[in-house]
């Protein structure tokens, strides 16, 4: 395994090393904004594995203009010391609206509960940067997961990359990442 900034890349494993062993005896899910070019490339590699190779949402790459925008924050999700997840967030305008997208966790690690920490980290971080609301396009099988995290549906499902997605929204004023209670 190759260590990057104190954690481990899942893409440079030797056949004899177990990733779960590398994660540590009692791994915890943690998230952080990428700190350098190597971490950003790892973030992009995880997205490539999930959105291009596994889900086939994109033909060759899921990269777009947001990846080159200096306001975009690329986040890595760690399971113990192993980088296995991502999320990307960026401001949509000056009104405080942010977008979260490219939430991805490598298949073998989805059972470890990293999706929730990644989403909560994105919500909290956008709020810390002055955001008031975050929107996201969610694949329909994941809508209930986002609702459990306090997100609300907005409008009807619409196709994105030839697959139905539901636009969802969450308020960022509550530091817990939960939408304010109605009324």
Predicted regions located by residue number:
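Conserved acetyl-CoA-binding loop-helix of GNAT-fold acetyltransferases
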Residues: 105, 111-124
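Conserved GNAT acetyl-CoA-binding A-motif
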Residues: 126-139
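Conserved beta-strand in the GNAT
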Residues: 76, 82-91, 97-104
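Conserved catalytic-core motifs of GNAT/GCN5-like acyltransferases
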Residues: 137, 152-169
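Low-acidity, Ser/Thr- and Arg-rich intrinsically disordered low-complexity segments
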Residues: 2-5, 9-12
